[in-house]
Amino acid sequence: MIMKRILTILALSLLCLTSNAQLVWKISGNGTKKPSYILGTHHGCPFTYCDSIPGLMKAFDKVDNIIGEINMIELAEMSPERMQKMQAMMMMPADTSLLSLFNKEETVKVNAWLIKELGANLEMLSMMNPMTIMVTVQNKVMMEVIPDVADMTTIDKYMQTLGQSKGKTIGELETTDYQMELLYGNSLEEQADALLEMIDLGNSKELMIQLTDAYKSQNLDTLWEIFQEQMTGYEYDAIVKVRNLNWEKQMKELL
C-alpha cells in the first residue's frame, strides 16, 4: 500500500493551478492524516538548483514515497523493444507522404522555417511525422539555451534517485506509453496543423530563455504567461488540461 506521506514531482504543466511564488506546496487537511508535498520542476533545470528551492529537502526528509510525472529510473532501463515501439510512433507511415499534409503555400512556409531551424526541408525530413519535427526543433532550442541539457541530471531524476537510495518508494503518475500517445495519438492532419501553429507563434528560443529565468526566480505568474504564449492549442489541451485533470484524480487517491 502507498504510504500517506508523499512527495509528488510534476513538470511545469502543473503550475497553472496556482500563482503563488513558490515551487514546493504542502498538502494537508481535508481528512489527510499526514502532509504530502508537490514540487514543480523544469526539465531544463539541473539538479544543482534543488539547493535554491526553499523547503524542498525538509519536505523530502518527511516523506516515504516519491511520485514522479514518470519513473525516471525505469526510463533509463527501457528495453530495446519499447524503444523500437516509440521510434515507430515518431515516423510517417509507409503509405503516407509528409508533403501530402501541406498545400503549396504551407509547404513554402514550412520549408523556409525548417531550413532556418534545422537546415533541412520537408523532403529531407520525409520519414518524420509533424510531431517529431516539432519535438526535434524544441529540443534544439533547449540545447541552444542550455548547452549541457543532454548530459545533465534533471531535478526529477535526482529526486527519484536520491529517494531510492534512502529506501523511499518510487512511483509515477504516467507511463512513457501514455506520454507517447499524448504526443502522437492525434491524426497526422492535426499534427500538421499544430506544426503550422508553432511556426506562426515563433520566438521559441527567446521564450525558452524567459521560461528558464522565470522558473529559477520562482515567478509563477510569468511562467504561466509564457506557457500561454508558447503553447499551441493542441499542446495546451494534451499537455496541460487533460493531464492536470488526470493528475488531480490520482493525487486524491494517493492522499
Label every model-predicted segment.
Residues 1-6:
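Positively charged n-region of N-terminal signal peptides that target proteins for export
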Residues 9-11, 30:
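N-terminal hydrophobic alpha-helix used for membrane targeting or insertion
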Residues 11-20:
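Hydrophobic h-region of N-terminal signal peptides that target proteins for export
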Residues 23-242:
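Structured, acidic catalytic/metal-binding patches in enzyme active sites
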